[in-house]
Amino acid sequence: MAKTIAYDEEARRGLERGLNALADAVKVTLGPKGRNVVLEKKWGAPTITNDGVSIAKEIELEDPYEKIGAELVKEVAKKTDDVAGDGTTTATVLAQALVREGLRNVAAGANPLGLKRGIEKAVEKVTETLLKGAKEVETKEQIAATAAISAGDQSIGDLIAEAMDKVGNEGVITVEESNTFGLQLELTEGMRFDKGYISGYFVTDPERQEAVLEDPYILLVSSKVSTVKDLLPLLEKVIGAGKPLLIIAEDVEGEALSTLVVNKIRGTFKSVAVKAPGFGDRRKAMLQDMAILTGGQVISEEVGLTLENADLSLLGKARKVVVTKDETTIVEGAGDTDAIAGRVAQIRQEIENSDSDYDREKLQERLAKLAGGVAVIKAGAATEVELKERKHRIEDAVRNAKAAVEEGIVAGGGVTLLQAAPTLDELKLEGDEATGANIVKVALEAPLKQIAFNSGLEPGVVAEKVRNLPAGHGLNAQTGVYEDLLAAGVADPVKVTRSALQNAASIAGLFLTTEAVVADKPEKEKASVPGGGDMGGMDF
């Protein structure tokens, strides 16, 4: 395919037009009085959202240079969303301000590389200031306030705080659509996975269709169990101990399954067989998680363990196991606390090293099952459009709350960024690097000014007033009052603010140092063939 090339000023201006087109659509959503954006979908109802990254993803521009500019800013929003779960609109507003100021200076003759170095040093200084001024999140109320700001709804904030209180900071909080109105919170104690009993004959509570085992032994096998002679020696030992047995294996079939079922029906011996969750390496890892949680070992030929030689010391234990047709919950496994902590640390390390979103999500689920628990927030609404929008807001707020717990909070509303600007004078930079730092200084005002503008106030006046207030005091855009924002519950997670600034600066540096853009030439539409043109003039 033929390419089209643009150089220096023309190239940079083309990219900037694309950036502005996208940023102007996104920035109207910033702040408590920000508006929504309607996104048309090819199929189904349109989506209404105020989430920066969702809006950015939908924007496709026709001009090849503008398209590349917009794609670069999408990257800012997406990266911020991946790292912090929120702050995508702030990142976009910062990127636009940095690029606008930067290109003005490049056009005036400044050296782009000098500007880039100045921007990087200034961002490093601001990040340091943010982390130094962060306040740890200690109370349920602080978590609720932070989540409520992200979701724009206090009831959502309260529910997320309650969920985090129950499952711990490492716990997984998932959001599901509900057929009823309002919000509901469901909690799972212990480790739950999505596999139920292999046979309905294992049920101990016919009314609830559940198999409940109190204080059972837990046998974990990495292969299929099909012959009784392999299982018999171990079964006799378990029966002798007078306890029920949960078998988790790749599969339990044939005479092994029928023996377990017959003994259950006769009342001789209570047991339940369940298939192990996952596939391949993930199944092995999850079985190992269960072994550590319950204090047992996985019976696997890879490590030289076989069923016929197994004894009770290789079995795990738990206070209670509940198995339904779809899922199994292990409550209070008897595993060693240090071993569990070691496994948690190992999974955390794997999450940090993984560059696949899917793998990270699965590892996060495993981590939650070991370290915390699982909470499900069920959201309902009158229409499908409202339901999708609400679910999206709650998911963002959950990630926002987790980010707050991780690195602490600072005053929200764009105030912390603006009030961090004076610290840049300490850098003592010269020449184009000083100009680069000044670009950051100007850009730090952009989020606050945009929040003020979206609230119907004069941005310049608000920025000047906030600049002269004590640290942490600023405009509460929801009420229009100038006050101590942390005390008023207007807070942003440091991780969100920091990521927004770092990602915006990264893309701005690329914009400023661009000297040429190579893009695909737009294809001209081929003229359509007139009707009957290929028929040799024949009539039909």
UniProtKB/Swiss-Prot annotation:
One of its GO terms (molecular function) is unfolded protein binding. There is a cross-link at residue 132 (Isoglutamyl lysine isopeptide (Lys-Gln) (interchain with Q-Cter in protein Pup)). Forms a cylinder of 14 subunits composed of two heptameric rings stacked back-to-back. Also exists as lower oligomers, including monomeric, dimeric, tetrameric and heptameric forms. Forms monomers under standard conditions but oligomerizes in the presence of high concentrations of ammonium salts and either ATP or ADP. Interacts with the co-chaperonin GroES. Interacts with the serine protease Hip1. Interacts with host CD43. This is Chaperonin GroEL 2. Gene3D superfamilies: GroEL, GroEL-like equatorial domain, TCP-1-like chaperonin intermediate domain. Induction: Induced in response to heat shock (45 degrees Celsius), pH 10, hyperosmolarity and starvation. Repressed by WhiB1, activated by Cmr. Each subunit is composed of an apical domain, an intermediate domain and an equatorial domain. The two hinges that connect the equatorial and intermediate domains (EI hinge) and the apical and intermediate domains (AI hinge) play a significant role in the chaperonin activity. The N-terminus is important in determining the oligomerization status. The record marks 13-14 as: Cleavage by Hip1. Its main location: secreted. Cleaved by the mycobacterial serine protease Hip1. Hip1-dependent cleavage of multimeric GroEL2 results in release of cleaved monomeric GroEL2 into the extracellular milieu. The gene is groEL2. Together with its co-chaperonin GroES, plays an essential role in assisting protein folding. The GroEL-GroES system forms a nano-cage that allows encapsulation of the non-native substrate proteins and provides a physical environment optimized to promote and accelerate protein folding. Prevents aggregation of substrate proteins and promotes their refolding. In vitro, activity may be independent of the presence or absence of the GroES co-chaperonin or ATP. Shows weak ATPase activity. Mediates association of bacteria with macrophages. Acts as an adhesin that binds CD43 on the host macrophage surface. The full-length protein elicits robust pro-inflammatory responses from dendritic cells (DCs) and promotes DC maturation and antigen presentation to T-cells. DCs exposed to full-length GroEL2 induce strong antigen-specific gamma interferon (IFN-gamma), interleukin-2 (IL-2), and IL-17A cytokine responses from CD4(+) T-cells. Residues 521-540 are annotated as: Disordered. InterPro entries: Chaperonin_Cpn60_CS, Cpn60/GroEL, Cpn60/GroEL/TCP-1, GroEL-like_apical_dom_sf, GROEL-like_equatorial_sf, TCP-1-like_intermed_sf. It catalyses: ATP + H2O + a folded polypeptide = ADP + phosphate + an unfolded polypeptide. Conditions that promote oligomer formation increase the ATPase activity. Chaperone activity is fundamentally influenced by the interdomain communication, even if oligomerization and the ability to recognize the substrates are retained. Residues 530-540 have a biased composition (Gly residues). Its EC number is 5.6.1.7. The lineage of its organism: Bacteria, Bacillati, Actinomycetota, Actinomycetes, Mycobacteriales.
